[in-house]
């Protein structure tokens, strides 16, 4: 049996402001930093250790990983930073308040943009300052692979090559792997691991800063998964994530 630990970054400044973030590189709030430290404490108390970690190239995930490593005294851990673990790109919605967007376009439309599998938000113009083409962190990524918007289906297609070529081989080699990433890049991976249908994935909400443990068989198929921590508080956090895109 193998174990894999996933963690969504702690609360970011735009999570707090209920804004669509995507590839915009916002930082953690004080609460987000505390969530990351608490995650590290939970993992340490439960006896976990790691051989390698994976994260995105966005600072909210990177700092979350730092705080977990710090709490676990694992600052020396090898870390792979990959754009493939970035949050889903929200296109022209990037920076907009979710509730205000729902008031303008309707809860149903925003739910489709946020949670449907194959409907992306409106795309950015290539000349938009939010487009990734001139960002130095993507200088080595072929331009045609850089998105101007994404649906979850696109995010799955972006994440899976990293899983197949790097993460899964590390797990099979017996390495203890930690992934610190984002709500939708983790939803993409979980959809693949658990075989969740395109329609059911709408209902999957991942709370900030809570370790999610997957126990996998020899074929890397999930045996079970569970969050570490106060289960009632985790359920409340998941419900709060689900409500973010509503006008009320």
Curated annotation (Swiss-Prot):
Q: Which residues bind substrate?
A: 8-15, 21-22, 60, 87-90, 98, 114-115, 183-184
Give the top-level enzyme category.
isomerase
Task: List keywords of the entry alphabetically.
Answer: Gluconeogenesis, Glycolysis, Isomerase
Q: What is the protein name for this chain?
A: 2,3-bisphosphoglycerate-dependent phosphoglycerate mutase
InterPro entries under this entry? His_Pase_superF_clade-1, His_PPase_superfam, PG/BPGM_mutase_AS, Phosphogly_mut1
The function of this protein is: Catalyzes the interconversion of 2-phosphoglycerate and 3-phosphoglycerate.
Assembly: Homodimer.
Kindly tell me the pathway this chain contributes to.
Answer: Carbohydrate degradation; glycolysis; pyruvate from D-glyceraldehyde 3-phosphate: step 3/5
Give the coiled coil ranges.
none
Task: Give the Gene Ontology MF terms in alphabetical order.
Answer: phosphoglycerate mutase activity
Q: Which species does the entry assign this protein to? A: Burkholderia cenocepacia (strain ATCC BAA-245 / DSM 16553 / LMG 16656 / NCTC 13227 / J2315 / CF5610) (Burkholderia cepacia (strain J2315))
User: Which residues does the UniProt site feature Transition state stabilizer point to?
Assistant: 182
Name of the gene encoding the protein in the UniProt record:
gpmA
The answer to whether keyword Glycosyltransferase applies is no
Q: Which domain of life is it from?
A: Bacteria
Q: Which Pfam families match?
A: His_Phos_1
Q: Per the UniProt record, which EC number(s) apply here?
A: 5.4.2.11
Q: Where is the active site?
A: 9, 87
The GO annotation for biological process reads: gluconeogenesis; glycolytic process
Tell me its family.
Answer: Belongs to the phosphoglycerate mutase family. BPG-dependent PGAM subfamily.
Catalysed conversion reaction: (2R)-2-phosphoglycerate = (2R)-3-phosphoglycerate
């Amino acid at each position: 049996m193998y174990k894999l630990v996933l963690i969504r970054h702690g609360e970011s400044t735009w999570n707090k402001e209920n804004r669509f973030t995507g590839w915009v590189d916002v930082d953690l709030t004080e609460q987000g930093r505390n969530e990351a430290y608490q995650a590290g404490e939970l993992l340490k108390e439960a006896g976990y250790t790691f051989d390698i970690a994976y994260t995105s190239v966005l600072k909210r995930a990177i700092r979350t990983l730092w705080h977990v490593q710090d709490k676990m005294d694992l600052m020396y851990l090898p870390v792979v930073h990959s754009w493939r673990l970035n949050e889903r790109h929200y296109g022209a919605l990037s920076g907009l308040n979710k509730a205000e967007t729902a008031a303008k376009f309707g809860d149903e439309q925003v739910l489709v943009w946020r949670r449907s599998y194959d409907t992306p938000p409106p795309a950015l113009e290539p000349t938009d300052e939010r487009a990734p083409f001139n960002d130095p962190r993507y200088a080595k990524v072929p331009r045609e692979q850089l998105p101007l918007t994404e649906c979850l289906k696109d995010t799955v297609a972006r994440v899976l090559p990293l899983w197949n070529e790097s993460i899964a081989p590390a797990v099979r080699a017996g390495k203890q792997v930690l992934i610190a990433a984002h709500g939708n890049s983790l939803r993409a991976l979980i959809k693949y691991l658990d075989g969740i249908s395109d329609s059911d994935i709408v209902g999957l909400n991942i709370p900030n800063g809570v370790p999610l443990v997957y126990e996998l068989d020899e074929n890397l198929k999930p045996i079970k998964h569970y969050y570490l921590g106060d289960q009632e508080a985790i359920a409340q956090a998941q419900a709060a994530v689900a409500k973010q895109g509503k006008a009320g």
